[in-house]
């Protein structure tokens, strides 16, 4: 089974893949089809042509991050509306492809700080409303109080809001490792 990986952040690391795959790197690497769009328009073209690549041999479509090139092009209100329509269409298309081909879909998003009530800032995804609309499951990742650990919070599962489910994990040379509390 293959993975289609759209690296819009230009952060895919072959070194990290080698660490995680270990001695299996020669069998793992050919299973990843990597796209590196340089613009939001190029990302759109790649997504619109993914259907030609999906088959029973594709297990995962991953986009890291789906909002980075979108964010670069944000401008005035008219341009923002146009970009929102394009992003919305991209997500609709990705969801359609994933459902029709029974393929897992993983999207990451950039985040930004938003000043909330009483001047308190909070972190939220770029294009949060569009992402929430199209996502069945949402995980929020945060640094934990212990510097070497991360925390994942399940915010939405199959359309239902969830607030109290979370886990601790560590990023190790082998990949993601569960951590006992």
Name each model-derived stretch.
Residues 7, 36, 65, 143, ...:
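Flexible glycine-/small-residue-rich
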Residues 30, 59, 136:
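Conserved acidic residues
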Residues 1-49:
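Conserved P-loop
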Residues 97-181:
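Phosphate-binding/switch region of NTP-binding enzymes
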Residues 37-42, 48-130:
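P-loop NTPase motor core
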């Amino acid at each position: 089974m293959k993975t289609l990986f759209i690296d819009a952040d230009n952060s895919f690391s072959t070194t990290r893949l080698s660490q995680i795959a270990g001695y299996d790197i020669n069998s793992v690497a050919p299973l990843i089809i990597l796209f590196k769009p340089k613009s939001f328009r190029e990302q759109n073209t790649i997504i619109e042509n993914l259907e030609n690549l999906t088959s029973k041999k594709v297990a995962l479509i991953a986009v890291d991050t789906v909002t980075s090139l979108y964010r670069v092009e944000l401008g005035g209100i008219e341009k923002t509306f146009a970009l929102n329509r394009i992003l919305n269409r991209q997500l609709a298309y990705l969801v359609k492809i994933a459902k029709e081909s029974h393929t897992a879909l993983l999207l990451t998003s950039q985040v930004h700080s938003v000043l909330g009530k009483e001047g308190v800032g909070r972190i939220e995804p770029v294009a949060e409303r569009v992402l929430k609309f199209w996502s069945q499951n949402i995980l929020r990742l945060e640094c934990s109080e212990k510097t070497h650990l991360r925390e994942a919070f399940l915010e939405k599962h199959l359309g239902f809001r969830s607030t109290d489910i979370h886990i601790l994990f560590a990023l190790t040379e082998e990949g993601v490792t569960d951590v006992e509390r």
